[in-house]
Amino acid sequence: MHRWTVFNEEINGNLVRVRPVGSVCHGIEFDEMACASVKSSTHNSLWRISEPGALQATNWESEHGFGSCVIDSSKDTPCRQGRIPYYAVMAQTPQHIQTAIQFARHHNLRVAIRNTGHDAIGRSSGRGSLQINVSGLKGIHFLDDFIPQGGYESQGQAVTVGAGVLGIELLTASRIQGVNVVTGTCSSVAATGGYLQGGGTSMLGPAYGMASDNALEFHVITAMGDTIVVNQYQNTDLFWSLRGGGGGTFGVVVNTTIRTFPDVPAVHFLLSSTIHRDTETSLDAEQSLWEITAEIAKLLPDLKRFNNATSSIIVPIRMEDRVTVTAEILLVNTSDIHSAGTYFTRLIKTLDSQGFPYTSNLTLYPQLSTYLSQQRVLDRAGYGIIEGSVLVSEDLFFHPDGISDIMLVLSSLQLEVGDSVEIFMCAGGQVKANKGRVTTALLPTWREAVLLLTIRRTLPPSSMIQRMRNSQLPRLRSLESPYLGSYLNVADPDEPDFRKAFWGDHYSRLYQIKHDRDPNGLFIVRIGVGSEDWDMDGICQFSKMQ
């Protein structure tokens, strides 16, 4: 313990002993008031960010064969550590991270880099690891004329963002500044971090490109414990790999400078439909779910032709007593609400003619930032979730039968209670235009894609998990040939060939950079670059890539 005590002193008392958040509800650690507080907070995403012993998806807190600590299980059920690290460095400065890396290297400890805990394939935790928690690095600094270190050419307006800054925090600050930035759709996902390093999908993707396309500079602490600047002029191998190569793999990113864009007008359409099973109606709930979804999806190619910067997200969900469909469509850099409205009027007439219930709203935002800075999706944390995703090409999307073919596959998936599908039009437009203009580690087929299809399941009995992996995801992957690949931030943790699915032809270069920059494997994450050389826990190295 003396070594840990000295280490804690070296990082100004920011080392904490970590137990799963459910520990206060079990055994000798039981505390009635604390347990009640945990239970009332468990689905709050911001609370989970603040707790180093919690993740957003609870299945990654547990470890098969090494136990779990489920909040709602019996008081007498033992609380096991699972995949939650025993210690966490709650970093407040880059120096704390440097010291932590040096300590981990000296004592041969596995490191888990943890920010908001949103990772859905288990990269933010690890059995027996030392957690480096960067959620406290909160700086935001806007720049009118950014020149990367070592360079001479201005990149225009930008903002330098600390690793722990949430998307909603950056968007709120950007609105005050009169600019926009590319961030994720969930308010509590970090604005940079693993989100950006994994590529970074966004409702602004078609207008401005992927989040990773807009990264201009990183400050990184390497596996050797060195603090370096990474941009197009220096450490160019890492500048390439950090933009799409995946989070938690190449170093600890302390801050990232990203491009900002002038505030512009936008038109936003929102539609929501709910059909209950227990009401007297002639509508079949499941059939109606897909018919409504299909009618919305049919609009997308025409909207894309009307405004190439259009994005959308359609989410059909099956619940125990009802089905719901929610759709958001965003047309960026236009104030022509009347022309846009003609498309939505067509949709409304179709839904009315078929007797579907819905609510809808069409809004002109003089400033896009007003829409972006609205807080969303903060109360869906604290569940076990698995998911998988598939890219859909522009060729299939614009084919006369393309949307029908997509909907035929989606409607055949036989959703279970709690399942959802996400049809995300987040590519095309500037994502496509950046092909050849922006050189990054991003999966190359993103430049050919328009849609990202995701199936998401709250954890049910194991047989249902296997059906998703053995039947539903293969159906999505067979939608077109060749298979374009998957988005590594919204991925099946058992993706059959993750190297090809996440990075395609870029993988061999990524693997070499990983080997050069982290030869001892300090930063190993599940199905990340170089992980094939290690066991699933990233503890035992057993092979080398041939």
Swiss-Prot record:
Nonribosomal peptide synthetase that mediates the biosynthesis of usterphenyllins and uscandidusins, p-terphenyl derivatives. The function of ucdF within the pathway still remains to be determined. The pathway begin with the biosynthesis of 4-hydroxyphenylpyruvate (HPPA) from L-tyrosine, possibly by the aminotransferase ucdG. The nonribosomal peptide synthetase ucdA then condenses two HPPA units to produce atromentin. SUPFAM superfamilies: FAD-binding/transporter-associated domain-like (SSF56176). Coiled coil: none annotated. PANTHER family: ALCOHOL OXIDASE, PUTATIVE (AFU_ORTHOLOGUE AFUA_4G00430)-RELATED, GULONOLACTONE OXIDASE. PROSITE patterns: FAD_PCMH (PS51387). The gene is ucdF. Residues 81-263 form the FAD-binding PCMH-type domain. Belongs to the oxygen-dependent FAD-linked oxidoreductase family. Disruption phenotype: Does not seem to affect the production of usterphenyllins and uscandidusins. This is Flavin-dependent oxygenase ucdF. GO terms for molecular function: FAD binding; oxidoreductase activity. Keywords: Oxidoreductase. Transmembrane segments: none annotated. Pfam families: BBE, FAD_binding_4. Signal peptide: none annotated. It comes from Aspergillus ustus. The keyword Oxidoreductase applies. Gene3D superfamilies: 3.30.465.10. Its EC number is 1.-.-.-.
